[in-house]
Amino acid sequence: MKWKTLLFLLLPPLMAWGQKDKDKGKAIQSLGTKQAHYTDVAKQIWGFAEMGYLEEKSSALLQGELSKAGFEIEKGVAGIPTAFIATYGSGKPIIGILGEFDALPGLSQEAFVPERKAILEGAPGHGCGHNLFGTGSLAAAVEVKNWLAQNKVPGTIRFYGTPAEEAGDAKVFMVRAGLFNGVDAVVSWHAADRNSAGPSTNLATKSGVFRFYGVAAHAAAAPERGRSALDGVEAMDMMVNMMR
């Protein structure tokens, strides 16, 4: 994990407090000295490779790192055992940093191997870089915390440990529980093939379940009495495509 990648997550919270360029340079240098440690954290989460809502080891590792750095930990928020909030400081602004750490099914893979080579065939793996996601957010939160403490600046940095991003919608439950109320800004990042600030937007999704019920009838004697559930599915598919 290149530590410079963390800079793009680190700068928005620091700019919220009006940090000077020389202080940004110090933050970058500080991250460089901790590169090996954060790389080890990312490797551990890679090895855990835990599915959504089951990230017990990954969540505990991140909580432990934040606790050692001086954050207060609130565990099991929104009724989710692996969700947590780590907070440092007081007053405004309140800056949130998202950290994800869940894996995907069937993507077990040995690290640093360019070809497909599962650690355990059929087991989960980090196909979307969430081992880096959680670790990078951890590093940024700790560095901002250190800056607040060293400069005696009022403000709050809040790390949101958000499990089950891939399919479990844990953030939705966290929002509904009011855990983001009063936050002035929330920043996030994602592992990619380049280092850049991403101003682009993404479409949101809202899931739902649709059931179609048919009516049975004799195909030869009374076909007019039958109703095909498949007809409804096909009609909906066609009309949704037309709406797009």
Language-model segments: residues:
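Short, functionally important structural connectors and interaction interfaces within domains
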Residues: W3, D23, K43, P93, ...
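Bacterial Sec-dependent N-terminal signal peptides
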Residues: M1-K20
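Histidine/acidic-residue-rich, glycine-tolerant segments that coordinate divalent metal ions
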Residues: K117-G125, N131-L132, L148-R244
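Enrichment for repetitive, rod-forming helical segments
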Residues: L9-L11, F133, S137
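Acidic/His- and Gly-rich active-site-bordering loop/insert found
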Residues: K20-H126, T135-G155
